[in-house]
């Protein structure tokens, strides 16, 4: 891999470290990541355009062009993309960081339908469990509960009237509870979505990483960012959707991680329902939102 990097990028290094997602090395004091690119190559030009708009104005990691002036590099049957990291890879994610990045760029005239995406996701995961269920008893026992949560989220989303002309902002495909800001500034994790997408994911993650300051953070966030009633309803719908469980599900069935990783989730369901109830009560103070009947009253 050292020879590949030197040949395509003119970077001569002594040591490359590999983990299950990327190759990593340090050059001139900066961390670089070399990823296998598994996405539709037709989207790479927009990926690069967005990256150029964000690099310099934020700590967005920079896509490095190869010696052929191409974004992607092919080697031994795989396609790679190289990025240079500017953010502190050890810094924890905060709502302030999410807010800053969401205000850095927006896009109009796109269609984002969480309800349809979630419904398709459930169908896909149901097919997976039907094919592999015997090997994963913990998933089999818990799956219907989380599908029920997702269906509630879909029903709630489908009642929301989306404002025409909404400006979709920089968001992220996935933010896990143990991620650092490196994930926020990874160009391959960038999407354009409703402003509250990342806020909702942060709130959910705050439960699992025991962030006891979440309500103070929300007060501070709302002082700086006005949310419309529509956006708060979108946030609630996303809170109801158990993205964390479905991400772990795919980690287990697709990436072959141990099934026991979901124990920390399924063993705290009563606590989590209480937590969601408290979050929704927090927003009800200033917004006319409906009660969620199945959540515990707080």
What kind of feature is each model-predicted range?
Residues 86-119:
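Conserved kinase catalytic-core helix
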Residues 195-228, 239-268:
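Active-site activation/catalytic loop segments of kinase-like enzymes and analogous catalytic loops
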Residues 246-298:
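ATP/Mg2+ or Mg2+-diphosphate-binding catalytic cores
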Residues 2-29:
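ATP-binding glycine-rich phosphate-binding loop
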Residues 21-45, 81:
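ATP-binding glycine-rich loop module of kinase domains
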